[in-house]
Amino acid sequence: DVDPVEKKLHPDEPISSVLRVRRGFVLADFDPASTPGFDEGRKEGEKALSAFAPEIGEWQERLFAETKGGGQRSLLIVLQGLDSAGKGGIVRHVMSNADPAGIKATAFKAPTEEERQHDFLWRVRKALPGPGQIGVFDRSHYEDVLITKVRKFVPAGEITKRYAIIN
């Protein structure tokens, strides 16, 4: 298997071929500044985005149209990154050709008092996109396990239960 960081993406190849984590992957060996599948600069990236941006609106329209015939599919995009990593900018740029009415974007910050009254996935389930919608999560349900473990907000036994639920 080719290292995904070094692999170049062929135009007919799915992006997952360079982004999927494979057995033996070591996070510490991954360069956080890398751009798997795209080795051009910012201007070239903006051109590439402009070229495929109209497709996003078309696919969104198809997804919504499917619901008129009873379709239940939705799309969830999960962005995970450090604070100020550009997750919001990605959403603005990539979704610029989509209909905002069909986008449900959620940024998961520290849980509110109401959210703490429920199980740790309650707020995630509430934010899932409905049929025909595209959901974008700024951070994921994994963070609710990671942060609570690192900062010792919940007992170790609860962390083990949460791992079992999300895996």
Residue ranges: model-predicted function:
Residues 1-167:
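Glycine-rich phosphate-binding loop of ATP-dependent small-molecule kinases
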